[in-house]
Amino acid sequence: MSRRRSAARPTAPAPRLLPSSPCPCGLPASYAECCGRLHRGQAAATTAEALMRSRYSAFAARDEAYLLRTWHPDTRPDSVDLDPALRWLRLEVLSTTEGGPFHAEGTVAFRAHYTEAREEGALTEHSRFVRHEGAWVYLDALALD
């Protein structure tokens, strides 16, 4: 997911994710045991899909620092558009290619469901991930909608 900063919008408090909250990425674990470990720097993504899920959760938690930290330096923007009116609802991973522990690159196709101004929508994207200095990072994406 690659939402870049756009025009200024009214701000709202970030959605509250407690350590015991279900992880936004959709895996059957608490936020603290799943993507929260990556967001806090206590673990690193071992696959491209794990990084994709953690980045989706970072969008849901409005964790701009994590999003920028996991973005390839060649394509990283100065800031990320974290629209306060948008609420991420759920993530569907549609397919993956490579992106495993022994790969140097991989792709993840996914659909991210959201609500904005009381209307539901979905973003379908095919994201590319590469290893940079040994860690998985987001490179770029092709919107599929």
Which residues are covered by each model-predicted region?
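Surface-exposed, charged secondary-structure patches
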Residues: 84-122
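Intrinsically disordered, low-complexity linkers and tails
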Residues: 1-17, 100, 109, 128
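Short beta-strand edge/turn micro-motifs at domain boundaries
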Residues: 124-145
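Cysteine-centered loop/knuckle micro-motif
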Residues: 33-35
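Core segments of small alpha/beta cavity-forming domains
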Residues: 38-84
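Contiguous, function-dense segments enriched for cysteine-driven chemistry
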Residues: 13-16, 45, 82-85, 102
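Short functional micro-motifs and their immediate structural scaffolds
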Residues: 28-30, 39-40
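Short Cys/His-rich zinc-binding micro-motifs
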Residues: 13-29
